[in-house]
Amino acid sequence: MNTFHLMLNLVKNAIEGTAFPKAEFSEKTLKDLFELSSDYSLANIVGYALINGGVLGSDEYSACFKNTVCAAVFLDAQMQRELGAMSRVFKSSGIEYIPLKGAVLKQYYPESWFRSCSDIDILVHKDDLEKAAEVLENELSYVPVHKGTHDISFFSKSSVHIEFHYELIEKDF
């Protein structure tokens, strides 16, 4: 079985919650598997399957997989905490919003941290944009970092990246 098919089988096992047949993996196989699954943003899921299969040891690439799983779980928890805090302050301020993309899709994965995300995308009505930005800055200490043609970016104190979208389609597109 080549590395790509091995990766797909491990992802399938993780998603279905089934065990991967017990096997020995060489350090080269783990290296190739880690590099390939990282390229596809699947190293966290592949790592989870390998951990559940009892495959990982104490070598360098086993550690890479374990660290990737831990980082994915940690980032997901941070993002969920920030989204919850934002939801509370927006509700109390009367700001309507719609979470977009990964923040919504995560609920359909067996584990929310299976869905790799680098930011939280939020649709805010253009009329509420200034108020929403002010609430994030004043009540949650977010820092604005960029204003584009269809979004504004912020970072939380814990380095979670939030994008307010006020246009779903770029005007220059």
Residue spans of the language-model regions?
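Conserved NTP-donor binding/palm subdomain of two-metal-ion nucleotidyltransferases/polymerases, i.e.
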Residues: 1-118, 124-173
